[in-house]
Amino acid sequence: MRASMFVLDQTVRYVAIIKRYKDGRKYYVVPGGKVEVHENIQQAAIREIAEELGLAIEQSDIFDSIIEKGNVFYFAKTNYSCLPLKIQGEEKERSHPHNSYEPMWLEWKQLSKLMVFPKYDYLQFEEIVSEIL
């Protein structure tokens, strides 16, 4: 099981995402990772966001979730206003010119046009985000 999280800024216009370049391919990744033995799925998602992006997410920030093919995607609305993101943790250590990680705030409506992993149902994503606008 993989724990991922869509982190939305305070305007609910932008989402934190990681642009990847690997072996000449460009794609995007929803921040997240594996669930460790001592934690539940939600704790794993919160930890991964802290490790990868340096963002502090509270349980109270999380307002919904969906499950897609062995992946749990949490949705968190934050008080962040698109502050600069820096890749951290294992991803920073593994980063080099042929395998790079570039965290960014992206207008969430653009996600439908991009190759994003892990795969998720964009229409369901849009419905969930639209409910809090």
What are these regions (language model features)?
Residues 1-30, 57, 61:
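N-terminal strand-loop-strand
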Residues 15-16, 47, 85, 130:
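Residue-level marker of intrinsically disordered, low-complexity segments enriched
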Residues 113-133:
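Charged phosphate-binding loop/patch that engages nucleotide di/tri-phosphates or the phosphate backbone
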Residues 35-117:
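Unchanged
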Residues 23, 27, 89-92, 103, ...:
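A generic structural signal for ordered alpha-helices
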Residues 14, 21, 27-28, 74, ...:
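Sequence-level detector for tyrosine residue identity
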